[in-house]
Swiss-Prot record:
CDD domains: F-BAR_FBP17, HR1_FBP17. The lineage of its organism: Eukaryota, Metazoa, Chordata, Craniata, Vertebrata. It comes from Xenopus laevis (African clawed frog). Residues 543-604 form the SH3 domain. This is Formin-binding protein 1 homolog. InterPro entries: AH/BAR_dom_sf, F_BAR, FCH_dom, FNBP1_F-BAR, HR1_rho-bd, SH3-like_dom_sf, SH3_domain.
Length: 610
């Protein structure tokens, strides 16, 4: 079936149809282009989503990523990132294999179609020209025939008329002959033009037009075939990434199967186990001992003389597992809230926290830790209680078990660093030997300098390892000793559970390094420093860096503050660090923070510089 023979008279319809075919192809190209944009945007959004939920370095999330469930989630995010990459592949292949190629093909198609229809119109113009020539020749032949017939009739009429002269008859006869000759010439010309037209028309409808229409048919079939191939390519582009997407999904499934509930539970134990033993039973407190006390027995409560005598002092049994971890530390650091503004007048009633405002019964800071300071033991973590303090190098601020793990981790890291330095030293040693044998390859002296530097680094790292291994051995020894001690104390509690409060005020070590005692009613117990070797260390008090004069009275009710009276002279041991508080000392053990705006500070420059 050929368009040239079947559609020889459908030139205009074929022109419209081929134009429609090109428009369909352009519509498909536009569809693929928009699909590629969607895939690209989708891949970008997936990557951003995966990046958004990735574990941030140097954050709490990085510490939590050790759990199997978190690892599985991170694996899922990584697989989704690869999954997004496959959608990018779809977008890129659709653009390069379909959009670009079909756009070029459409341009070629338009050019070819234009050329074919130009040839068709040219053939039509040619046949139309021949037709016009035929019509003109036919009309001329018809006109000449009529003119010859009229001339013949005129001659016959003149010849039959006896009144007409012979000359007029001859003239009419000649005129008729001329007209007959012209008619014969027109007839010959018309016959020639007609033959030519028939020949042109035959070539037009049986040669030119079929050839042009066949080319149009081939062009259209090529367009249709190319679109079919493109649709197949469209499917193949997606099919090619299906195995990789399947692997991504398999990775997610595998990570989900790797989640271990028991392992995560064990990690929680390893992360938060303190190494302390649970507290023993609380002993009975015999308050009838107050009736047997003498006047000298109550001398221990002299430190509470500043408290309101109407408010009875209550004994507090504080069990360390139920105390906030930073409770003790907050007592020795500056208050978290901003200091109160200075009063408008020096009247005590105008001072915040003055005597006219409701007050909460509070023991002075030095009295709170009276028993702690008896033998002058101080906690290791006191070193870091200054504002802006950092974690101690020996991790003494951590519970024993966590401290042991941190120290072990530090030792392992240092050993890895040492191994790296040793490997680098071995490589440089070989390089130096090569340079020594072949000086043209490099300078052996420069390598020797690097070897000296690496040797120094190794020595420093080994010193660090010995230091941390010493702390680690110390912690491990204390943990084993504490376990033995706890077993002995468990038997002691069973035999002494009926003792009075004077015999049952046993110190307990808390996870944050603090100890809890009941010292409100028993005589002062002298504690030797060896009992607190696990978490305390002797440290000299802060030196005095100046003096200050209180210009307003301040009744320190918050933890870590100290009360002062107007005009009182005190010692400054720590400057204002920008938070509005200054640390001062009244006596050896009575110190705390007051608002900087409530005092006039006179710093000793020599002490400050030293």
């Amino acid at each position: 079936m050929s368009w040239g023979t079947e559609l020889w008279d459908q030139f205009d319809n074929l022109e419209k149809h081929t134009q429609w075919g090109i428009e369909v192809l352009e519509k498909y190209i536009k569809f693929v282009k928009e699909r590629a944009e969607i895939e690209s945007n989708y891949a970008k959004q997936l990557r951003n989503l995966s990046k958004k939920y990735q574990t941030k370095k140097n954050s709490k999330e990085e510490e939590e990523s050790k759990y199997t469930s978190c690892k599985a989630f991170q694996t899922t995010l990584n697989e989704m990132n690869d999954y997004a990459g496959q959608h990018e592949v779809i977008s890129e292949n659709a653009a390069s294999l379909i959009t670009v190629e079909l756009t070029r093909f459409v341009q070629e198609l338009k050019q070819e179609r234009k050329q074919h229809f130009h040839e068709g119109r040219k053939a039509q113009q040619q046949i139309e020209t021949c037709w016009k020539q035929l019509e003109a020749s036919k009309r001329r032949f018809e006109r000449d025939c009529k003119e010859a017939e009229r001339a013949q009739q005129h001659f016959e009429k003149m010849d039959a008329d006896i009144n007409v002269t012979k000359a007029d008859v001859e003239k009419a006869r000649q005129q008729a002959q001329i007209r007959h000759q012209m008619s014969d010439d027109s007839k010959g010309d018309y016959s020639s033009v007609l033959q030519k037209f028939n020949r042109e028309q035959h070539e037009h409808y049986f040669t030119h037009i079929p050839g042009i229409f066949q080319k149009l048919q081939d062009m259209e079939e090529k367009r249709i075939g190319r679109m079919g191939e493109s649709l197949k390519t469209y499917a193949d582009i997606d099919r090619q990434v299906v195995p990789i997407i399947g692997k991504c999904l398999d990775g997610i499934t595998k990570s989900a199967e790797s989640i271990s509930e028991k392992q995560d539970s064990q990690m929680v134990v390893e992360s938060f186990k303190s190494g302390f033993e649970p507290p023993g039973d609380i002993d009975f407190e015999d308050f009838t001992q107050n009736m047997k006390r003498t006047v000298s027995d109550t001398s221990l409560t002299k430190a509470d003389s500043k408290s309101d005598p109407k408010v009875p002092s209550k004994s507090r049994n504080k069990l360390w597992p139920f105390i906030k971890k930073n409770k003790l530390m907050s007592l020795l650091t500056s208050p978290h809230q901003p200091p109160p503004p200075p009063p408008a007048s020096s009247s005590p009633s105008a001072v915040p926290n003055g005597p006219h405002s409701p007050k909460q019964q509070k023991e002075p800071l030095s009295h709170r830790f009276n028993d702690f300071m008896t033998s002058k033991p101080k906690m290791h973590c006191f070193r870091s209680l200054k504002r802006g303090g950092s974690t101690p190098e020996d991790f003494s601020n951590l519970p024993p078990e966590q401290r042991r793990k941190k120290l072990q981790q530090k030792v392992d890291e240092l050993n890895k660093d040492i191994q790296k330095e040793i490997d680098q030293r071995d490589a440089l040693t070989k390089m130096r030997d090569v340079y020594t044998k072949n000086p043209q390859m490099g300078d052996a002296a420069s390598v020797g300098q690097k070897l000296v530097e690496i040797g120094n680094n190794i020595e420093k790292l080994r010193v660090e390892v010995q230091k941390f291994e010493g702390w680690l051995a110390e912690v491990e020894g204390r943990l084993s000793a504490r376990n033995d001690s706890s077993r002995r104390q468990s038997g002691l509690y069973d035999t002494q559970n009926t003792q009075t409060v004077n015999n049952c005020a046993q110190d307990r070590e808390s996870p944050d390094g603090s100890y809890t005692e009941d010292h409100s009613q028993e005589p002062e117990v002298k504690v030797t420093p060896t009992e607190f070797d696990d978490d305390f260390d002797d440290e000299e008090p802060l030196p005095t860096i100046g003096t200050c004069k209180a210009i307003y009275p301040f009744d320190g009710e918050n933890e870590g503050t100290i009360s002062v009276t107007e005009g009182e002279i005190l010692k400054v041991i720590e400057e204002d660090k920008g938070d509005g508080w200054t640390r001062i000392r009244r006596s050896e053990e009575d110190e705390g923070y007051v608002p900087t705006s409530y005092i006039e500070v006179y710093l000793d420059r020599n002490a400050k510089d030293s």
